[in-house]
Amino acid sequence: MRTFAPWILSLLGASAVASAADATAEAPSDVVSLTGDTFETFVKEHDLVLAEFFAPWCGHCKALAPKYEQAATELKEKNIPLVKVDCTEEEALCRDQGVEGYPTLKIFRGLDAVKPYQGARQTEAIVSYMVKQSLPAVSPVTPENLEEIKTMDKIVVIGYIASDDQTANDIFTTFAESQRDNYLFAATSDASIAKAEGVKQPSIVLYKDFDEKKATYDGEIEQDALLSWVKTASTPLVGELGPETYSGYITAGIPLAYIFAETKEEREQFTEEFKFIAEKHKGSINIVTIDAKLYGAHAGNLNLDPSKFPAFAIQDPEKNAKYPYDQSKEVKAKDIGKFIQDVLDDKVEPSIKSEAIPETQEGPVTVVVAHSYKDLVLDNEKDVLLEFYAPWCGHCKALAPKYEELASLYKDIPEVTIAKIDATANDVPDSITGFPTIKLFAAGAKDSPVEYEGSRTVEDLANFVKENGKHKVDALEVDPKKEQESGDATETRAASDETETPAATSDDKSEHDEL
């Protein structure tokens, strides 16, 4: 199961929050402020719009503000407007747009073609992403615009395919459409341009502003092969990890090796020293440097001591495995090279972070830790409802008394376990995208847990267990009093939920503390 810890993104962006928190809103702005009265008209009048739905008190919104502003200025000359909507003032508009957290960024091509912005929240990333959105999936290349197109983005993929090769053209176009959010694509059928670039038709060339500057693919034009090649060719031999690059690395499908260093000089030195190792293992593992002064806390998530640098660790998101390198040893390329090879050869046991297994279970909710996860969650014939929580999570704290009440319903029902695990203190083999996350591991189907997305009330959670569990236990029927009380809970739910989100929906089903 592929999984990673998305809350790391908050660590990678945390340093920006404080510096941006006091940014003034009085200066002239290229970001257009819209209201319920102006939003629809503005969107209809523009072919492409990026909209931010925010709240003034939101820390992540404050951190984004200067980057969003700068991106708006850079995109203004390209006629790509960036707008913002204050959801504390425009609740109805935000509710209509399905806003469930802050900030929410959405791309509009008119009112009926809306999709979420899925790039990084950095100026360069926003500009790059929106420029790609403004272009066709595949831009035409001519002798006159070739050099311009090659440098339009950090990564540009150009297909040199003859016009009569319909199969290759169709596959390349389909591939470009599927990846247009990630890369800028162009193509030409002009054989003279291909010859000038030193390639034969059909070939795909990836131009980049780092390493060897370009890479050529002359294999079979096939979707999966192209995707694998583009991902590998577009990744620096030794990159720099930050908020704008984290997601790409962690979803690449191969292990990620981290080199933590506190100074720019150290990171540059490690980059040069590790290039030959990165070249040797290209396509099998990615290697990055990371600023330990800004993001050193992430070392703790890799089971390293976050106070001792330089440091090295490998993370395999596909297996949710972590391999910290012995911090008593110096980080030397030769030794690390052997360590990497041993990890790839499965000769190194992964490190598992776990709290101590409780000597006794106190209270109705079963406490799970990494070392008891297999026994309590997976290796049994029970329906197990498991909450993944974080101690600092406000929504988790609000859920706690209701979750305990839920667990009390099942205290005499051996077929069902209501459990929780601190996902910040234990390595968990599941994909967690927010806190709290609640999953039901049904007996006989432990490898395909069902995530709960409903309202967090006792009766709704109990019904979820009944409907999705193997044993179909109806705890409310066992406790008729609870069933009688469910009507009162339903009546009060809407009122309490209005304080949870900007869009006052009927429940709090999508509420997570932002990660």
UniProtKB/Swiss-Prot annotation:
InterPro entries associated with the record: PDI_thioredoxin-like_dom, Prot_disulphide_isomerase, Thioredoxin-like_sf, Thioredoxin_CS, Thioredoxin_domain
GO annotation terms (biological process): protein folding; response to endoplasmic reticulum stress
Q: Which PROSITE patterns match?
A: ER_TARGET (PS00014), THIOREDOXIN_1 (PS00194), THIOREDOXIN_2 (PS51352)
- The active site of this protein is located at 58 (nucleophile), 61 (nucleophile), 393 (nucleophile), 396 (nucleophile)
> Origin, by domain of life?
Eukaryota
**Cellular compartments annotated:** Endoplasmic reticulum lumen
Site Contributes to redox potential value: give positions: 59-60, 394-395
Q: Where is this site: Lowers pKa of C-terminal Cys of first active site?
A: 121
**What Pfam families does the record tag this protein with?**
Thioredoxin, Thioredoxin_6
Keywords (alphabetical) are:
Disulfide bond, Endoplasmic reticulum, Isomerase, Redox-active center, Repeat, Signal
Q: Where is this region: Disordered?
A: 472-515
Please list the residue ranges that the record marks as compositionally biased, kind Basic and acidic residues. Answer: 472-496, 506-515
The EC number of this protein is: 5.3.4.1
User: Gene3D superfamilies this protein is in?
Assistant: Glutaredoxin
> Motif span (Prevents secretion from ER)?
512-515
Site feature Lowers pKa of C-terminal Cys of second active site, where? 456
Signal peptide from the UniProt entry:
1-20
Q: List the disulfide bonds.
A: 58-61, 393-396
Domain Thioredoxin, first and last residues per copy? 21-136, 343-470
GO-annotated cellular components: endoplasmic reticulum lumen
Q: Which reaction does it catalyse?
A: Catalyzes the rearrangement of -S-S- bonds in proteins
- Entry's Gene Ontology molecular function annotations: protein disulfide isomerase activity
Q: Which family does it belong to?
A: Belongs to the protein disulfide isomerase family.
PANTHER family from the UniProt entry: PROTEIN DISULFIDE ISOMERASE, PROTEIN DISULFIDE-ISOMERASE A3
Q: Briefly, what is this protein's role?
A: Participates in the folding of proteins containing disulfide bonds, may be involved in glycosylation, prolyl hydroxylation and triglyceride transfer.
The protein's name is: Protein disulfide-isomerase
Organism, as annotated: Aspergillus oryzae (strain ATCC 42149 / RIB 40) (Yellow koji mold)
